[in-house]
From Swiss-Prot:
InterPro entries: DXP_reductoisomerase, DXP_reductoisomerase_C, DXP_reductoisomerase_N, DXPR_C, DXPR_C_sf, NAD(P)-bd_dom_sf. SUPFAM superfamilies: 1-deoxy-D-xylulose-5-phosphate reductoisomerase, C-terminal domain, Glyceraldehyde-3-phosphate dehydrogenase-like, C-terminal domain, NAD(P)-binding Rossmann-fold domains. Keywords: Isoprene biosynthesis, Manganese, Metal-binding, NADP, Oxidoreductase. This is 1-deoxy-D-xylulose 5-phosphate reductoisomerase. Its EC number is 1.1.1.267. Coiled coil: none annotated.
Length: 391
């Protein structure tokens, strides 16, 4: 089991060139860089110049590109550095298996499932930013973490908030958790207005700086829907214990309600480096140069119930949790296909949820996964079914 408490932490970052990966490296450098952290492996996809620069800067032992065709390019970029180079699935597996007590799982999508599962099974502490591990693989992934004996440290700001305020010796007294949602750029728009919004308009998140896909997921609240499913597995909750509240300021990141009526919340300025820093230094707290919350300047905190007519993704997540089986994988696979069609202008914003619901109807009753092959098969079925509904 990884202790996670050593003075110099040895780590691997799966997905170092993405948003979470680059933020993780930023936090590492702010906390002392190579004096305090030893980088076993970094993995990326197509941004070879950035991956090579990161590997050189951090003195990584191994650099991996998930794109097998780019092996030569990465090899040339790291020529003379002494850094090992690998590529493709084999390379990702090698990075996951490399001896490191702490692993940031930040590869986006199903590509992150295999290496993250492998790292969990060998007992690494997993800082989890990949949604599919819990949404699609659910109990399979939780079982792998238990089998390995490492710790699971959520990096999503909402789940990280719950993790921080959840008293381990009082879990039996948890009545509910409350995930906060900003409401996104369309919080006050009517149904008719939402049907005609564009992908570029969905990108304008009021509080967080994110990529196009995650911004659209946030605008449709599909991101929050996935977080509901993740929370169920992370904290071993019933579906009826998970609530969502719209909080436009994104200052209260989430809350835990206890049986005695107490509600504990974690607050902070919206900055992913806070959650990353907490996961990176756990169980200690580190000194991070992030913006401090000024309550006098903040003045007010607003909360409102989500409108599940305009944002049906929340209802679909609840259904997926209640039905169980592989419905999480089905929801996610269908959503990914519908999202791609929306970005391409082939379907409207509200059509995405309708497509997902139809696919969930068609594929209802798939049994719980017993292997990753089951998860991938359900995902592929959902994507194909969704594609068949798109003009």
């Amino acid at each position: 089991m990884a202790s996670g408490d050593e003075l110099k932490r040895r780590l691997t970052i799966l997905g170092s060139t993405g948003s979470i990966g680059t933020s993780t490296l930023d936090v590492i450098e702010r906390l002392g860089g190579r004096d305090r952290f030893e980088v076993a492996a970094l993995t990326g996809n197509g941004n070879i110049p950035l991956l090579a620069a990161q590997a050189r800067r951090m003195g990584a032992e191994l650099a991996v590109t998930a794109d097998g065709d780019r092996y030569g390019e990465l090899k040339d970029a790291l020529s003379g550095s002494g850094i090992e180079v690998a590529a493709g699935r084999t390379g990702l597996s090698e990075a996951a298996e490399r001896d490191a007590g702490w692993v940031m799982a930040a590869i986006v999508g199903n590509a992150g499932l295999g290496p993250t599962l492998a790292a969990a099974r060998r007992g690494a502490d997993i800082a989890l930013a990949n949604k599919e591990c819990l949404v699609s693989a659910g109990s399979l992934f939780i079982d792998a973490v238990a089998e390995g004996g490492g710790r699971l440290l959520p990096v999503d700001s909402e789940h990280n908030a719950i993790f921080q305020v959840l008293e381990n010796d009082q879990r039996h007294a948890v009545e509910r958790i409350v995930l906060t949602a900003s409401g996104g750029p369309f919080r006050t728009k009517s149904l008719d207005e939402m049907q005609h919004v564009t992908a570029e308009a969905a990108r304008a998140h009021p509080n967080w700086s994110m990529g196009l896909k995650i911004s659209i997921d946030s605008a449709s609240m599909f991101n929050k829907a996935l977080e509901m499913i993740e929370a169920r597995h992370l904290f071993n909750l019933r579906p009826d214990q998970i609530e969502v509240i719209v909080h436009p300021q994104s200052v209260v990141h989430s809350m835990v309600g206890y049986a005695d009526g107490s509600v504990l919340a974690q607050l902070g300025c919206p900055d992913m480096r806070t959650a990353i820093g907490y996961a990176l230094s756990y169980p200690r707290r580190c000194d991070l140069p992030v913006e401090r919350l000024d309550f006098a300047r903040l003045a007010r905190l607003d909360f409102e119930a989500p409108d599940e007519v305009r944002f049906p993704a929340l209802r679909l997540a609840r259904r997926a949790m209640e039905e169980g089986g592989l419905q999480g994988a089905v929801l996610n696979g269908a959503k990914e296909t519908a999202l791609g069609a929306f970005i391409e202008g082939r379907v409207g914003f509200l059509d995405m949820a309708e497509i997902v619901e139809e696919v969930m109807n068609d594929l209802a009753g798939l049994p719980a996964a017993t292997s990753m092959d089951d998860v991938f098969a359900a995902d592929e079925q959902a994507r194909q079914a969704a594609a068949g509904m798109i003009p």
